[in-house]
Regions:
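Short, glycine-rich nucleotide/cofactor-binding loops
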Residues: 40-48
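Periplasmic OmpA/Pal-like peptidoglycan-binding modules at the C-termini of bacterial envelope proteins
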Residues: 85-123
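Extracytoplasmic/secreted proteins, especially bacterial periplasmic and envelope-associated proteins
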Residues: 3, 7, 47-54, 85-89
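Short, surface-exposed beta-strand segments enriched in small/polar/acidic residues
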Residues: 30-38, 52-87, 104-111
Length: 123
């Protein structure tokens, strides 16, 4: 997974995207909400779409890897359902990029103000 983490980092160096090794077999990718969704909306913005395309490419290069977590935040003061709807939009974008549903965790509402993906090998 270190090779895939480094490959993704090379694409997003100098951007607000954070890619961090979590263990020998997993890394996380986080993107600030402002680069992902307009306030109150669930449509994926182009910066997040570009990142999801690269994550999909990475998963295709590592057929045993999975998305262990797909989480998105809501907006301050918004209904909690917004976060889950956004996570579902992220998942749909990954499906459209060729990532099979069987390789993704169910979408979840995230905490904080970032879209969070955890990539790794299932235990």
């Amino acid at each position: 997974m270190a090779v895939e983490r480094q490959w993704l980092q090379s694409w997003f160096e100098g951007t607000p995207v954070r890619i961090e090794q979590r263990s020998a077999s997993a890394f996380s990718v986080s993107v600030p909400r402002s680069f992902c969704f307009e306030a109150g909306a669930t449509q994926v913005l182009p910066p997040l779409a570009a990142l999801l395309d690269k994550v999909a490419q990475s998963l295709k290069r590592q057929p045993e890897a999975r998305l262990l977590r797909v989480a998105a935040p809501g907006d301050a003061g918004a209904a909690p359902a917004l976060a889950l709807q956004r996570a579902e939009a992220v998942r749909r974008q990954l499906l459209a990029n060729g990532v099979p549903a069987s390789r993704m965790a169910a979408p979840s509402a995230g905490e904080g103000a970032v879209v969070l993906l955890r990539v790794g090998f299932a235990p």
